């Protein structure tokens, strides 16, 4: 396997649930991104609803899309 790209994580709040396990997330920085659920979260049936605090992994190449990697308790 190759080295993973240098993605960075930010905290945010889910504002809207969309189709195909996509969500609109308001980041702490004030930006809003589209994010999908990571495969391991889908595998373990972790549910995400609007209002949840989540950790989003963003690629440095496209800061408008992300991947939800953790849901705060």
Swiss-Prot record:
Q: Gene Ontology terms, cellular component aspect?
A: cytosol
User: Which key words tag this protein in UniProt?
Assistant: Cytoplasm, Initiation factor, Protein biosynthesis, RNA-binding, rRNA-binding
Just give the chief location class.
cytoplasm
Give the superkingdom in one word: Bacteria
Q: For this protein, what is any one GO molecular function term?
A: translation initiation factor activity
Q: Which InterPro entries match?
A: NA-bd_OB-fold, RNA-binding_domain_S1_IF1, S1_domain, TIF_IF1
Q: Report the leader peptide range.
A: none
Q: Where in the cell is it found?
A: Cytoplasm
Annotated S1-like domain residues: 1-73
The role this protein plays is: One of the essential components for the initiation of protein synthesis. Stabilizes the binding of IF-2 and IF-3 on the 30S subunit to which N-formylmethionyl-tRNA(fMet) subsequently binds. Helps modulate mRNA selection, yielding the 30S pre-initiation complex (PIC). Upon addition of the 50S ribosomal subunit IF-1, IF-2 and IF-3 are released leaving the mature 70S translation initiation complex.
NCBIfam families in the cross-refs: infA (TIGR00008)
Which family does the record claim for this protein? Belongs to the IF-1 family.
Record text on subunit structure and interactions = Component of the 30S ribosomal translation pre-initiation complex which assembles on the 30S ribosome in the order IF-2 and IF-3, IF-1 and N-formylmethionyl-tRNA(fMet); mRNA recruitment can occur at any time during PIC assembly.
Per its record, how is this protein called by name? Translation initiation factor IF-1
């Amino acid at each position: 396997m190759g080295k993973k790209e240098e993605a960075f994580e930010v905290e945010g709040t889910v504002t809207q649930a969309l189709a195909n396990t996509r969500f609109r997330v308001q980041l702490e920085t004030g930006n809003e991104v589209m994010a999908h659920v990571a495969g391991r979260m889908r595998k373990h049936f972790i549910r995400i609803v609007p209002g949840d605090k989540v950790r989003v992994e963003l690629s440095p190449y496209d800061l408008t899309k992300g991947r939800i990697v953790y849901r705060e308790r």
